[in-house]
């Protein structure tokens, strides 16, 4: 399997192409994109071997096709794919955030000797476009492969072998399970974050302190509300049934805690918070999950001149790079005055060791 065709060369498609081109130079990487400028940029930075201007010619020669396009667009491509001449045992995958709609074409494509294995690389960036592609974007991130028909098991293995150079952590599951679980850990949190921001905005009109005090931890908690609105509108409707069910469950929890507060039931309110803390504290902290995250370290430093410089100098001496640094003005429940964000959990662990003279901890 030498000929890999990418349909769509944004951040995700470009990063996958960049990885395959760098680590597997024997492959021929081709790409088709409605935005011709993206193709020219990809060719100029060397992450593809050739640009495809005729879609039918591209799919005709491909051994594997990777659709890095929005879910609705991918569905249109899959629906029409059997109308084109393709290689025997063609393997097709995508990079979308929901899978039930995509995998609904699985048996239809199998009947045409096309093997569909859905893909969901759980990594991304606030930046977009092929020029922001990074070959290491998927390191230590979960990469979920999805199929519902056992006849696609071998194709899933081949796809995982191809993508092994991404250093992602592969999980195989069904479309239904994927969409429900990502609804719990990703889609609902995005809705909650946006709701909190709307709540803050509404109250800021009569309470000017809201905007000022929301600059600290509140901004971190609601960071994902700054995600692309077009993308999240599409994700919401492509996972509509699961999201509505989960919102009903969430509403029941909110109604329950409201009732306990109204009745001054201190034991139940305590159980609400302690139960959440217990479960959260058991969650892994060294791996990337469904939500894109920064690997933060909190450092307790005295309010003295030169202390921040001292911390950054120590990290620099150990060749540890950081992605952000923030002085916390509002830090209830947070001991450290300095928040340092690292790009990887490994860098954070090295940072903890390098800063052994300071009190550090992870939330």
Swiss-Prot record:
Any single Pfam family the record assigns to this protein: PDH_N
Ligand binding (NAD(+)): 3-33
Domain Prephenate/arogenate dehydrogenase as annotated: residue spans: 2-291
Catalysed transformations (reactions): prephenate + NAD(+) = 3-(4-hydroxyphenyl)pyruvate + CO2 + NADH
GO biological process terms on file: tyrosine biosynthetic process
Endpoints of the signal sequence: none
Family listed: Belongs to the prephenate/arogenate dehydrogenase family.
UniProt protein name: Prephenate dehydrogenase
Source species of the chain: Staphylococcus haemolyticus (strain JCSC1435)
Classification of source organism: Bacteria, Bacillati, Bacillota, Bacilli, Bacillales
